[in-house]
């Protein structure tokens, strides 16, 4: 956000030079509770400029790295222990751990994507996150108790109807959930995600839980943070790249000089909070669209190739499928070899004649048919394989659940009539992808011509 002369200059913690900073200095007990703190202006002079990889290597026992940074190895190990304490504290109080991963799309000098890799989240990354979370909470609680105008980062409780949809969806996987949608606790949601850890559908279930939550936003009123199970929260730790953080730094400085400035902040914070929330949503949407376009551009070179993939979502007009490199595409229902019944209750597609059934988390063999970098759309086709699940002899659903007709031709017509536009399948698929948010990303791309039976990576973590 700030110009590079500032972000990489006087605002950057370069080694062996003094830097003027705003610091939250906290004393934390063995249970992860802040027992004493000071928020003040300080001067920092760092010894080394390190990378996350350096710290992860040190904690993993790399002899060369430990020798290179031997002066601070004890401090790094102590920081890792503190992180573990803070993480355990958050889990015990009910913080939700959305296990999602992010992609890093590598491009050449011309901006053409050449690879898609997984953003690493080792102990070092999580350690810094723990410290930032605690600093944000401490600063927010400080100003709340002073009863001064302030900007908070809030995450309100999810709406009951959205939680009920998640409960219904989770039940389709055989999960027993205790409690009603309006009273379900964060601990129960934690238990659900722990119970499915390692399952093929864990990634999708985690995403469905995330989508059942309300969107975090900025506000002049403190409503706590549901996802973190925190009573107070703000954004304080990233003033270089986020305006609300910069505003918090200004308030710390200005309130330290005079309380009379409170009237000014009381007037401007509501508009700033609304504007910052709106801009954040626009930035996220732009990021998703660009990511989809770059993934489609990357896959243009692989049209016609076959891969093992995993069903990531099932809708009435087809199924979305994800490759091990996190690229997602659509197999439209009209491109399947027979008529398929859509079961909205358990989100399955079942072939009327063969009994071939598709479920979320199931492996599937596909061919890349089309990739459009301008729209970010990717089309796959289904290839029969040893992954196919046959469920014959099952009673078919009622007429209302039989889809959009008894053959593919009438299915197309009914689909157009219900949608009110001829290109319903592409617009629905594009809209559905936009709502999904980020998908899990894996380091290795599926290899061309991979043999049947190749497994899928796992893991998804986010807040």
Cite the ranges covered by each PLM segment.
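Short acidic, flexible loop segments centered on an aromatic residue
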Residues: 323-326, 384
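Electropositive polyanion-binding surfaces
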Residues: 1-323, 330-337, 409-413, 418-440, ...
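Intrinsically disordered, low-complexity linker and terminal regions at domain boundaries
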Residues: 6-8, 332-378, 384, 388-405
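A generic "binding-loop/recognition-motif" signal
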Residues: 315-317, 327, 364, 374
């Amino acid at each position: 956000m700030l110009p590079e002369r500032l972000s990489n200059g006087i605002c950057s913690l370069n080694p062996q030079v003094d830097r003027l900073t705003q610091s939250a200095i906290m004393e934390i007990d063995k249970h992860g509770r802040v027992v004493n703190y000071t928020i003040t202006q300080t001067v920092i002079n760092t010894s080394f400029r390190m990378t996350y990889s350096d710290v992860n290597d040190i904690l993993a026992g790399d002899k060369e790295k430990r020798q290179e940074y031997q002066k601070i190895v004890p401090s790094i190990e102590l920081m890792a222990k503190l992180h573990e304490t803070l993480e355990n504290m958050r889990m015990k109080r009910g913080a939700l751990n959305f296990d999602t991963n992010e992609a890093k799309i590598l491009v050449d000098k011309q901006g053409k994507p050449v690879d898609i890799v997984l953003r690493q989240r080792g102990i070092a990354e999580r350690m810094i996150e723990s410290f930032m979370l605690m600093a944000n909470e401490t600063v927010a609680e400080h100003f709340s108790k002073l009863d001064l105008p302030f900007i908070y980062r809030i995450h309100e409780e999810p709406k009951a109807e959205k939680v009920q949809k998640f409960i219904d969806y989770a039940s389709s996987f055989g999960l027993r959930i205790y409690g009603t949608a309006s009273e379900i606790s964060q601990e129960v949601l934690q238990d659900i995600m722990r119970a499915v850890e390692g399952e093929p559908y864990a990634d999708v279930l985690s995403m469905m839980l995330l989508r059942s939550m309300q969107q975090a936003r900025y506000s002049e009123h403190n409503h706590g943070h549901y996802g973190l199970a925190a009573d107070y929260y703000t954004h304080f730790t990233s003033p270089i790249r986020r305006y609300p953080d910069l505003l918090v730094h200004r308030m710390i400085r200005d309130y330290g000089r005079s309380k009379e400035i409170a009237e000014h902040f009381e007037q401007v914070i509501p508009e700033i909070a609304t504007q910052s929330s709106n801009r954040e949503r626009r930035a996220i949407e732009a990021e998703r669209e660009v990511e989809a376009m770059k993934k489609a551009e990357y896959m243009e070179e692989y049209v016609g190739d076959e891969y093992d993939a995993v069903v990531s979502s099932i809708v009435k007009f087809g199924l979305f499928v994800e490759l091990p490199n996190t690229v997602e595409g659509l197999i439209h229902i009209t491109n399947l070899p027979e008529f398929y019944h859509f079961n909205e209750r358990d989100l399955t597609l079942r072939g009327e004649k063969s009994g071939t059934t598709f479920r979320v988390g199931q492996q599937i063999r596909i061919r890349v048919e089309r990739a459009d970098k301008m729209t970010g759309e990717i089309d796959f086709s289904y290839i029969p394989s040893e992954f196919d699940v046959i469920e014959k002899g099952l009673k078919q659903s009622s007429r209302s659940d039989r889809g959009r007709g008894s053959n593919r031709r009438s299915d197309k017509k009914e689909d157009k009539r219900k949608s009110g536009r001829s290109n319903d399948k592409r617009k629905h698929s594009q809209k559905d992808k936009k709502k999904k948010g980020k998908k899990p990303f894996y380091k290795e791309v599926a290899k061309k011509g991979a043999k049947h039976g190749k497994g899928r990576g796992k893991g998804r973590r986010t807040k």
